[in-house]
Amino acid sequence: PGAEKWQGILDALKEEYALASLQILPQCHIVNDVIQNKKEVGFIARKGKDVKSRLEQVPGISDKTIVFIYLGDMGAQSVQWENLQQLEDMVFLTRDPLPKNVANLFVLDDRFLYQDLIASSDIVCTKAGYSTLSTAFAHDKPVISCSRENFHEFATMRDYMSDKQIGLIMDSTKFFSCDWEDDIRKALKFSVKGKVPLNGEDEVMKIIDCILKG
């Protein structure tokens, strides 16, 4: 949508991209016919460490299903966060600037890294974006998300998660009303392990090494 407004810039980018001798495509990529030589690789992800022992020092977190939330600026102000309190056997962790008056929603600061919180959670609730999906899958965490309008990659990510049974897209009405329980329990039954290639970094390094060696 709106591409015609930027047609001059898009044409210039297409011309520049066409000069590339190789395009490296991690998982969930969009098919294009601009660059002829392509190489698909695994996900490229940020690796974290499990910090659940630190998290469980906070009263109310121990022995609960842990859901990590990352939405950034994607309509978070429209979500009825107070309804999360109805999910009494779950806790929700986030680094986003969300309300701090919801009993089971913990807003953490930068002492906790995003990738560590993902590694320590049971499931990830996020906007469908590459970096969060790849980090979740690298730690064998299933994902729940909602639709993203005007985000061209969304359809590819939605189909990828559906085909591999590693995540699901919630109905928008349920998402914004925080009616998440059924979808969380459904997604928790998904297994990510062994379903997606995670060796993107190694493959890219090999490609670069071959190029440098000529």
Predicted features by range, described:
Residues 46-123:
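Donor-nucleotide binding loops and adjacent catalytic segments primarily
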Residues 12, 112-113, 132, 179, ...:
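Short acidic active-site motifs
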Residues 142-187:
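Nucleotide-sugar donor-binding patch of glycosyltransferase catalytic domains
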